[in-house]
Amino acid sequence: TLEPDEELLDEYNLLNYDLDTDKYAKRLSPSKYTIDSYSVTMRRGGEMPYALLPIKIRPQGLSPDSLYMIPLKLTSVSAYEINPKKNRVLYQVVLENDYASEKDNTLMSMRGTRQIGDGTVSKIAANKRMYPLSKQEVRINAGMENSGNKADLELINKYSIIVKIGEERTLTYNGVSYYPLTVYPY
């Protein structure tokens, strides 16, 4: 049986980031996840020496710029003794949809033109990282400004856009069907 661990995340943050509180991992709010049962069963003689604990995450409203954790502690077992040095776990939440993942750097190739203040037009090309926001949405940094530093929220908020991908291929061009895209400010 597992239960939430109220101290583990604070210990983790202090050990890994000390006074750099901007980098601290955040405790995922219980309103953002469901654990139907905090009990799991390991099969006797099974090939895999572990058991899975299903956790359902509701990602809507979570920021890809934050590190979210669910701290858990093993509190009881039926047949064995618990090792007090190995009875805690930090479950890291990784946002992912069909278009982007926090785990892997999902890149989009960008080509276009940019008009500078004096009217001069120049060509631009870059690979842009996409961040998952919801089932059908990703965030992309627009233009050539660099918001690669996740901690630079001012740049992220100023230069990012949200791309919403339609659920069905409703656009056709030259016999090929495409998902419609809606683009709006972040």
Where are these regions (language model features)?
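Intrinsically disordered, low-complexity regulatory regions in eukaryotic proteins
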Residues: 1-41, 50-186
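Short helix/turn-capping signatures at newly exposed starts of structured segments
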Residues: 45-47
